[in-house]
């Protein structure tokens, strides 16, 4: 009889503890969303809040058009809110150029984008530039702003 009473007390105590401590209950096996950490989270937030990371130019152009300025304005707004983040603007040629011409066009595009971000109040130390010639022709007529 004592064993039965003891067993009953243990079972009741366990169920009461489960009711009082809901975090001990077994949860449904629902898939959990992966939590982005650190730089990956910043990159994802930048892309989502700034409307993407790529800014396009016209063929053989280094002048920022209205869509490019609008995209860079969104990026500048995000960067001003995150002064701890450093970005690199990578410029690209048009893909049909010679290597040297593609590097020069990419550098001018990257510098134009950087200058516009600085004009909008992004600190100079927060933005660097680089250029790709024929090494990365896939993103011709564009600059890409990369969170580092």
Where is each model-derived feature located?
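Generic anion/oxyanion-binding catalytic loop in active/binding sites
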Residues: 8, 61, 99
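Hydrophobic h-region of N-terminal signal peptides that target proteins for export
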Residues: 9-18
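Residues within well-formed alpha-helices
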Residues: 18, 67, 74, 109-112, ...
């Amino acid at each position: 009889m004592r064993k039965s009473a003891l067993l009953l007390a243990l079972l009741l105590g366990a169920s009461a503890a489960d009711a009082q401590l809901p975090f001990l209950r077994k949860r449904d096996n629902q898939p959990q969303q992966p939590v982005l950490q650190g730089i990956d989270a910043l990159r994802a937030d930048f892309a989502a809040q700034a409307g993407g990371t790529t800014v396009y130019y016209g063929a053989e152009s280094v002048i920022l058009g209205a869509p490019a300025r609008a995209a860079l304005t969104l990026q500048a707004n995000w960067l001003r809110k995150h002064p701890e983040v450093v970005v690199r603007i990578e410029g690209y040629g048009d893909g049909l150029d010679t290597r040297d011409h593609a590097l020069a066009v990419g550098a001018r595009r990257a510098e134009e984008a950087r200058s516009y971000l600085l004009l909008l109040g992004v600190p100079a130390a927060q933005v660097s530039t680089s250029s790709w010639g024929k090494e990365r022709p896939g993103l011709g007529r564009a600059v890409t702003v990369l969170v580092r």
